[in-house]
Amino acid sequence: MAVYRKKISPIKPTEAVDYKDIDLLRKFITEQGKILPKRSTGLTSKQQKKLTKAIKQARILSLLPFLNKD
């Protein structure tokens, strides 16, 4: 029987997710510019929703690209 361990959230529950913190947001985006899913990041549902909104807001304000064209 396999034992599964709960992933520890990389963002502390007290830490605020802000659209201006580009370095933090880039950790949760793939090379193509897609937002990583909750199951691979280890975030809680609340944190994932806040992160998604922050990434989308940063994209609209041109702080992050919609697509990475490399």
Curated annotation (Swiss-Prot):
Pfam family, one: Ribosomal_S18
InterPro entries found in the cross-reference section: Ribosomal_bS18, Ribosomal_bS18_CS, Ribosomal_bS18_sf
GO CC list: chloroplast; mitochondrial small ribosomal subunit
Keyword RNA-binding: yes
Keywords per UniProt: Chloroplast, Plastid, Ribonucleoprotein, Ribosomal protein, RNA-binding, rRNA-binding
Keyword Ribonucleoprotein: yes
Subcellular location: Plastid, Chloroplast
One Gene Ontology term of the molecular function aspect: small ribosomal subunit rRNA binding
GO BP: translation
PROSITE patterns noted in UniProt: RIBOSOMAL_S18 (PS00057)
Subunit annotation: Part of the 30S ribosomal subunit.
Stated family: Belongs to the bacterial ribosomal protein bS18 family.
Protein name, per record: Small ribosomal subunit protein bS18c
